[in-house]
């Protein structure tokens, strides 16, 4: 079955389902799905999640049962107090001892840099994670370089996770549902990097009612709109963010200055749709687009430079419950990152382009043969298009362009299988 938030329809990641008479339980996965095999009989079921009312139901098991549970937030008149604990042996016996799950709501309560809640700045507070210096792009995990971290947004690789030369991350906290960082002992489903995995998932959107959220910071503002497509079946979320550094710079550079028109700003946009086709099938479509724009003008010498760069990702995902013990997820993934340098003086124009584009597909299965085993297996394929350097230049009527001749094409494939066994 699945576990949902009763007010928003969001799937609940990590909801705990426990049968006291059998002292057995299960935790919902990243799609809110759970599966457990039990002997025939009648049992009490307890479903709990921090900040939500615990659900207790009497369940009769005389055949395969599929249920959907909706959890209501717990109302309280006083300030929230959350007490959490972990089994003292979890750090040494758990197969996920290198995984840290970050609470997005907790991140929003931390001091924000220039009014912006930042995922990358938050994870740098964790042990084993650091930044080389203030303003540096990326993060370092246990001595590994920034290029040794696999950063995923809804399964799509993000090659440059920073704005403003490292001061901000590309992740808008208003559009994020969960953040996991794996610093060691990476599961078999992830590959291609040595140091860590940063897995970020976007909100699915509220399938009960329209909601609008926004914020104004010192350097940027943001706006998020979410709501149902069809109530209880589908929802959407769109979120945008933009700096107004260009407006501030314009106020400090007068029109008569030789450097009038010099500017910098960044913007990004997140969107996600999901729809429940049947009780066993659900589709998701999510995307991200972000861009930094820097330009420098020297009007006296008729000289100008501009440097745009940014990421774009897209993920189309299909979830299917094949049977009570087997869950499938199929994804089609698009990723693009590019950097461009453009310069001109009088009639001469010069442009340099560099980038990487990926087209990929992935299939994942999760099999629950019994309550002590969780078997995951699947495969993926990625078609890479690398553009190390593409140059174009124009002087009056003379044009030079390398075009696609500098492109490098690559194919990457992988299969995996893993079994998480609870002794």
Where are these regions (language model features)?
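Periplasm-facing N-terminal accessory domains of Gram-negative outer-membrane beta-barrel systems
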Residues: 1-80, 84-86
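Outer-membrane beta-barrel domain signature
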Residues: 6, 109-110, 166, 210-212, ...
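Periplasmic N-terminal accessory/gating domains of Gram-negative outer-membrane beta-barrel systems
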Residues: 53, 82-186, 197, 203-204
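Membrane-embedded beta-strand positions in outer-membrane beta-barrel channels/transporters
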Residues: 68, 80, 120, 138, ...
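Structural signature of outer-membrane beta-barrel domains
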Residues: 88, 146, 158, 203, ...
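Residues that define the transmembrane beta-barrel architecture of outer-membrane proteins
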Residues: 115-117, 192-194, 217-221, 265-267, ...
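Predominantly transmembrane beta-strands of Gram-negative outer membrane beta-barrel pores used
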Residues: 150, 178-189, 195-203, 210-276, ...
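Face-selective signature of the C-terminal outer-membrane beta-barrel domain
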Residues: 274-292, 308-423
